[in-house]
Protein backbone atom coordinates (compact mmCIF):
# COMPACT_ATOMS: atom_id res chain seq x y z
CA UNK A 1 0.00 0.00 0.00
CA UNK A 2 1.00 3.61 -0.61
CA UNK A 3 0.31 6.31 1.99
CA UNK A 4 0.32 10.08 1.64
CA UNK A 5 0.54 12.50 4.55
CA UNK A 6 -1.29 15.79 4.18
CA UNK A 7 -3.56 14.08 1.67
CA UNK A 8 -6.26 16.78 1.78
CA UNK A 9 -3.76 19.63 1.56
CA UNK A 10 -3.00 21.77 -1.47
CA UNK A 11 -0.26 19.48 -2.79
CA UNK A 12 -1.65 16.21 -1.42
CA UNK A 13 -4.94 16.54 -3.31
CA UNK A 14 -3.07 16.83 -6.61
CA UNK A 15 -0.83 13.87 -5.76
CA UNK A 16 -3.89 11.71 -5.05
CA UNK A 17 -5.51 12.71 -8.35
CA UNK A 18 -2.41 11.56 -10.20
CA UNK A 19 -1.86 8.45 -8.11
CA UNK A 20 -5.41 7.18 -8.61
CA UNK A 21 -4.85 7.04 -12.37
CA UNK A 22 -2.29 4.25 -11.91
CA UNK A 23 -2.89 2.71 -8.47
CA UNK A 24 -6.16 1.08 -7.31
CA UNK A 25 -7.90 3.26 -4.72
CA UNK A 26 -7.97 0.47 -2.13
CA UNK A 27 -4.15 0.42 -2.25
CA UNK A 28 -3.89 4.11 -1.34
CA UNK A 29 -3.95 5.41 2.24
CA UNK A 30 -4.78 9.08 2.79
CA UNK A 31 -3.42 10.23 6.15
CA UNK A 32 -5.39 13.25 7.29
CA UNK A 33 -5.98 15.32 10.41
CA UNK A 34 -9.69 15.70 9.72
CA UNK A 35 -11.43 12.68 8.14
CA UNK A 36 -14.52 14.79 7.38
CA UNK A 37 -12.45 16.65 4.78
CA UNK A 38 -11.58 13.31 3.14
CA UNK A 39 -15.13 12.05 2.62
CA UNK A 40 -14.83 12.32 -1.17
CA UNK A 41 -11.69 10.16 -1.00
CA UNK A 42 -13.50 7.49 1.01
CA UNK A 43 -16.26 7.49 -1.61
CA UNK A 44 -13.62 6.74 -4.27
CA UNK A 45 -12.40 3.75 -2.25
CA UNK A 46 -9.27 5.38 -0.80
CA UNK A 47 -8.42 4.18 2.71
CA UNK A 48 -8.62 7.21 5.02
CA UNK A 49 -6.73 7.14 8.33
CA UNK A 50 -6.54 9.91 10.90
CA UNK A 51 -3.19 11.07 12.28
CA UNK A 52 -1.40 14.31 13.02
CA UNK A 53 2.31 15.04 12.57
CA UNK A 54 2.49 15.70 16.30
CA UNK A 55 1.20 12.25 17.34
CA UNK A 56 3.76 9.51 16.69
CA UNK A 57 1.52 6.75 18.09
CA UNK A 58 -1.37 7.71 15.79
CA UNK A 59 1.04 7.89 12.85
CA UNK A 60 2.38 4.42 13.64
CA UNK A 61 -1.16 3.04 13.67
CA UNK A 62 -2.03 4.87 10.43
CA UNK A 63 1.02 3.44 8.67
CA UNK A 64 0.30 -0.21 9.45
CA UNK A 65 0.40 -2.27 6.25
CA UNK A 66 1.98 0.57 4.25
CA UNK A 67 4.99 -0.20 2.03
CA UNK A 68 5.62 3.25 0.56
CA UNK A 69 5.06 6.68 2.08
CA UNK A 70 4.98 10.14 0.56
CA UNK A 71 5.90 12.49 3.39
CA UNK A 72 4.61 15.89 2.36
CA UNK A 73 6.48 18.40 4.47
CA UNK A 74 4.59 20.03 7.30
CA UNK A 75 3.47 23.62 6.87
CA UNK A 76 4.37 24.53 10.45
CA UNK A 77 7.64 26.44 10.10
CA UNK A 78 9.77 25.94 13.20
CA UNK A 79 8.06 22.63 14.00
CA UNK A 80 8.86 20.69 10.84
CA UNK A 81 11.93 18.81 12.09
CA UNK A 82 10.15 17.51 15.20
CA UNK A 83 7.02 16.62 13.25
CA UNK A 84 8.94 14.92 10.48
CA UNK A 85 10.91 12.93 13.05
CA UNK A 86 7.58 11.63 14.37
CA UNK A 87 6.56 10.50 10.88
CA UNK A 88 9.91 8.84 10.17
CA UNK A 89 9.95 7.07 13.54
CA UNK A 90 6.37 5.90 12.97
CA UNK A 91 7.23 4.68 9.47
CA UNK A 92 10.15 2.69 10.84
CA UNK A 93 8.00 1.18 13.60
CA UNK A 94 5.28 0.26 11.08
CA UNK A 95 7.72 -1.39 8.66
CA UNK A 96 7.45 1.13 5.81
CA UNK A 97 10.05 0.22 3.17
CA UNK A 98 10.34 3.47 1.17
CA UNK A 99 9.74 7.17 1.86
CA UNK A 100 9.63 9.99 -0.68
CA UNK A 101 9.96 13.40 0.97
CA UNK A 102 9.00 16.82 -0.41
CA UNK A 103 12.02 18.93 0.46
CA UNK A 104 13.26 22.31 -0.81
CA UNK A 105 15.01 22.99 -4.12
CA UNK A 106 18.80 22.81 -3.56
CA UNK A 107 18.15 22.50 0.17
CA UNK A 108 21.78 21.61 0.82
CA UNK A 109 23.03 24.93 -0.57
CA UNK A 110 19.98 27.19 -0.20
CA UNK A 111 20.38 30.40 1.84
CA UNK A 112 16.66 30.32 2.72
CA UNK A 113 15.84 29.96 6.39
CA UNK A 114 13.43 27.16 5.50
CA UNK A 115 16.32 25.01 4.31
CA UNK A 116 17.54 24.09 7.80
CA UNK A 117 14.44 22.07 8.66
CA UNK A 118 14.49 20.32 5.30
CA UNK A 119 18.18 19.44 5.67
CA UNK A 120 17.47 18.11 9.17
CA UNK A 121 14.69 15.92 7.76
CA UNK A 122 16.90 14.70 4.92
CA UNK A 123 19.52 13.67 7.51
CA UNK A 124 16.88 11.87 9.59
CA UNK A 125 15.87 9.93 6.49
CA UNK A 126 19.49 9.04 5.73
CA UNK A 127 19.96 7.83 9.31
CA UNK A 128 16.65 5.92 9.44
CA UNK A 129 17.72 2.86 7.48
CA UNK A 130 14.60 3.22 5.30
CA UNK A 131 15.09 3.57 1.53
CA UNK A 132 14.13 7.08 0.45
CA UNK A 133 14.03 9.64 -2.35
CA UNK A 134 14.09 13.42 -2.08
CA UNK A 135 11.70 15.56 -4.09
CA UNK A 136 13.28 18.98 -3.74
CA UNK A 137 10.44 21.21 -4.89
CA UNK A 138 11.05 24.73 -6.09
CA UNK A 139 8.76 27.74 -5.80
CA UNK A 140 5.04 27.15 -6.34
CA UNK A 141 3.58 29.33 -9.08
CA UNK A 142 0.46 29.65 -6.91
CA UNK A 143 2.52 31.63 -4.39
CA UNK A 144 2.18 34.61 -6.74
CA UNK A 145 -1.62 34.67 -6.55
CA UNK A 146 -1.77 36.88 -3.45
CA UNK A 147 0.24 39.59 -5.20
CA UNK A 148 -1.72 39.40 -8.48
CA UNK A 149 -4.46 41.98 -7.65
CA UNK A 150 -2.06 44.78 -6.61
CA UNK A 151 0.25 43.92 -9.52
CA UNK A 152 -2.64 44.28 -11.95
CA UNK A 153 -3.80 47.48 -10.27
CA UNK A 154 -0.35 49.12 -10.45
CA UNK A 155 0.79 47.54 -13.72
CA UNK A 156 3.97 46.11 -12.25
CA UNK A 157 4.93 42.88 -10.56
CA UNK A 158 7.17 43.42 -7.55
CA UNK A 159 9.31 40.58 -6.24
CA UNK A 160 12.36 40.05 -4.08
CA UNK A 161 14.54 38.38 -6.71
CA UNK A 162 16.04 41.61 -8.05
CA UNK A 163 17.36 40.77 -11.50
CA UNK A 164 17.25 37.07 -10.68
CA UNK A 165 14.81 34.69 -12.26
CA UNK A 166 12.65 32.02 -10.67
CA UNK A 167 11.57 28.89 -12.53
CA UNK A 168 8.37 28.22 -10.63
CA UNK A 169 6.03 25.31 -11.32
CA UNK A 170 2.46 24.60 -10.31
CA UNK A 171 1.53 22.31 -7.45
CA UNK A 172 -0.05 20.04 -10.07
CA UNK A 173 3.35 19.67 -11.78
CA UNK A 174 5.17 18.85 -8.54
CA UNK A 175 2.35 16.45 -7.63
CA UNK A 176 2.68 14.59 -10.94
CA UNK A 177 6.37 14.01 -10.21
CA UNK A 178 5.64 12.88 -6.65
CA UNK A 179 2.97 10.43 -7.80
CA UNK A 180 5.38 8.82 -10.27
CA UNK A 181 8.17 8.51 -7.72
CA UNK A 182 5.91 6.94 -5.09
CA UNK A 183 4.11 4.60 -7.52
CA UNK A 184 7.09 3.39 -9.54
CA UNK A 185 10.14 1.37 -8.55
CA UNK A 186 13.76 2.45 -8.92
CA UNK A 187 13.76 5.80 -7.14
CA UNK A 188 15.49 4.83 -3.88
CA UNK A 189 18.55 6.98 -3.23
CA UNK A 190 17.57 9.56 -5.83
CA UNK A 191 17.50 13.32 -5.29
CA UNK A 192 15.23 15.19 -7.68
CA UNK A 193 15.74 18.96 -7.97
CA UNK A 194 12.34 20.04 -9.29
CA UNK A 195 11.38 23.40 -10.79
CA UNK A 196 9.72 24.91 -13.84
CA UNK A 197 11.24 24.43 -17.28
CA UNK A 198 11.96 28.11 -17.84
CA UNK A 199 12.66 31.15 -15.66
Regions picked out by a protein language model, each given a short descriptive name:
Residues 1-37, 54-57, 64, 75-85, ...:
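Oxidoreductase cofactor-interface core, primarily capturing Rossmann-like NAD(P)-dependent enzymes
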Residues 37-44, 61:
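Short loop/helix-cap segments at secondary-structure boundaries that form the rim of catalytic
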Residues 42-55:
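Rossmann-fold cofactor-recognition segment
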Residues 48, 98-99:
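A short hydrophobic/small-residue beta-strand
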Residues 51, 68-72, 101:
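Redox-cofactor binding/interface segments in oxidoreductases and associated redox assembly factors
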Amino acid sequence: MIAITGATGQLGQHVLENLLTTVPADQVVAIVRNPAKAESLSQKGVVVRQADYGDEAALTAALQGVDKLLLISSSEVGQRAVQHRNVINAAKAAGVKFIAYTSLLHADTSPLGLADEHIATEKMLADSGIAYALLRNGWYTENYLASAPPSIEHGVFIGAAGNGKIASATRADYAAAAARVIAEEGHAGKVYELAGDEA
